[in-house]
Amino acid sequence: MKKIIRLASKGDGVTEDGQFVPNSVPDDYISDDGKLEFGAHHIEPVCRHFSVCGGCRLQYADEEVYKNFLTDRIAEAFHQQALSAPVLKTAHLSPPYSRRRVALRAFKAGKKLTLGYNKTSSHQLVDIVECPLLDKNLFKAAMDLRSFLQKWLAPRSLAQIEMTLADQGIDCLLVMPFPETLEATEAITAFAAEKGFARLSIDQGYGVETRWESERVTVTLGAVPVTLPAHAFLQATKDGEQTLVHMVKEAVGDAHFVADLFSGLGTFALSFEKDKRVYAAEGMRDAVLALKQAAALAGKAVFVEHRDLFRRPLQKDELVRFECIILDPPRAGAKEQIANLAILPNGRIVYVSCNPATFARDAKTLLEAGWVLHWVKPVGQFPWSLHVEMVGLFTKM
């Protein structure tokens, strides 16, 4: 018998002698004939689709194991950069049924419509009838789409579905071919109104066309309603967003003049009280316009610039003006911007990341330039998945 001692980065259990054992957790045992004996941390998956659906990976791990797994993912990323693991705070997990945005797919073969997620490591679809990840209103809206797609999705056609729980209700974008007929147009309006959708848009490959919007669709950030553009980035759960905002505000402290780089719609920029002055830079035009409008209407001291920080990162003479700099880049990290931050003589950096590998890479650049990493807070917004968000505080005296 061999004991499972840890989880590897892809979620497989690992024994002391390095054997990888799928679907196992620490304190499980694997016998010589391959039979797995469950330990105290191995629990029953909560979804009937688990093991087939690719939406979740670790439903059989209890909360203690899952928190340790997310924390270890960050520590391992630092080890890969030949760095000591940072001070890691206890991971925060968003609860089940809390996801407020989702991407699904639907395919019609003959008269059969399949709607759901991809199977694990496959392009095949799993037809879902439940999902413990999603807010119940979001899941209901996804199921409501079945009848609409059954009629209007052409045979052998694929629909990409993006859904967000906005302030006014469900914002739905369907990427699919759609008939340009009066009947089809009226069907969209009737369906969206009947099901109470806030907005329903179609993209046939030529850009997003809003076909139904009963009122301006917004998402509230920092108590400020912000117009929600199509494809805009939004934290996966409100709970996760609140945790990230809390940690960022704690790290920013009493800094008065703050930069928010890769600001998006203003998750952090709009969270501060009016006594702080915030410069926000973002490369997505629609997000910039939405943030500008929201900040102005709320009377927030937020200056917003449309700026591609990969091609035109802030330079040293621009950065030295700020008492604290927040970064929240996409998965690729902020290599170009970090190079300019590293050479600053002093300051405070709050780095929010969704990728341990690029976070550790960028942290190495800062650490080698004399910055100190005080702590990292892991945040699990995607229950039972391999993904982890994190906030880290760097200072240089």
UniProtKB/Swiss-Prot annotation:
Q: What class of enzyme is it?
A: transferase
Query: Which keywords does this Swiss-Prot/TrEMBL entry list?
Result: 4Fe-4S, Iron, Iron-sulfur, Metal-binding, Methyltransferase, S-adenosyl-L-methionine, Transferase
Q: Name one Pfam family in it.
A: tRNA_U5-meth_tr
Where, by residue number, does [4Fe-4S] cluster bind?
47, 53, 56, 131
The record lists its disulfide bonds as none
Domain of life, per lineage? Bacteria
Q: What is its EC number?
A: 2.1.1.-
Tagged with keyword Transferase: yes
One GO BP? methylation
Give the transmembrane ranges. Answer: none
Instruction: Give the GO molecular function terms.
Output: 4 iron, 4 sulfur cluster binding; metal ion binding; RNA methyltransferase activity
Q: Which PROSITE patterns match?
A: SAM_MT_RNA_M5U (PS51687), TRMA_1 (PS01230)
- Kindly give the InterPro entries that the UniProt entry links to this protein: MeTrfase_TrmA_AS (IPR030390), SAM-dependent_MTases_sf (IPR029063), U5_MeTrfase_fam (IPR010280)
Entry keyword Metal-binding: yes
Residues engaged in binding S-adenosyl-L-methionine: 235, 262, 282, 328
Task: Give the annotated active site.
Answer: 354 (nucleophile)
Which family does the record assign?
Belongs to the class I-like SAM-binding methyltransferase superfamily. RNA M5U methyltransferase family.
| UniProt name for this protein | Uncharacterized RNA methyltransferase ZMO1179
**Originating species:** Zymomonas mobilis subsp. mobilis (strain ATCC 31821 / ZM4 / CP4)
Q: What is the lineage of its organism?
A: Bacteria, Pseudomonadati, Pseudomonadota, Alphaproteobacteria, Sphingomonadales
